[in-house]
Amino acid sequence: MFGFFFVAFVAVFGIVFFISYKLLEDREDTDSDWSSSQSPEPDYFQQTQTAPWELKYNKGKQGEYQLGQVLNQLYGYKKILYNLYIFKEDGTTTEIDALLIHPSGIYIFESKNYKGWIFGSENQQYWTQVLSGGRGKSYKHSFFNPIIQNKVHLRWLSYYLNQYTPNLYSYIIFGNDCQLKEIHLNSDRHKVIQTWQVIGAIDRQACQSQVYLSPEQIDDLYRMLLPLTKRKQ
């Protein structure tokens, strides 16, 4: 009788151990899915001084990186910069998440890698993120209006470039895991879109542009702006 219970105990223990091992293995595979599905982009890591493994634990950096991968798919000659620190009049800095130098001009991106529902309008100081809490509950989180943030970026970038200022475009980019439920804009000066919409939006903007930057001009602007990625607050 004892032998029967012992064999049964060993069998149950073995099954539990096997299931636990598989669950752990599946979890590790899931954790590695994000990083393994991304092709490396040396410019991002070099400019931001971010290690590839850090992306898995930082949603903000994930959003910037994913945006960079999309921008790299744009046709034609271009340059991309990340985390530019531009000095303001009072000596403090304002940070641009990502910037694209394109034949049609300069695109300034404020990246928000959020989930849930997003509500906001151009003139509100704060926007709202609504997250599901399960069982019919929801939680609200306020965050500073990203359009106002980008207005500051545009102002001081224009000041920094001085006379050498092509068209400047303001883009607020939300991640693909959210829903832009109610976004009210007063004009078309700012675009509020998701990552999957970026290529189409820039292609349309480029078609309407009266500016054409040559590869030499793009390189000049890149050399002018690259040092700003080295500055820290």
Regions found by a protein language model. Give the residues of each.
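Surface-exposed interaction regions that form or flank ligand-binding interfaces
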Residues: 1-94, 101-106, 112, 117-120, ...
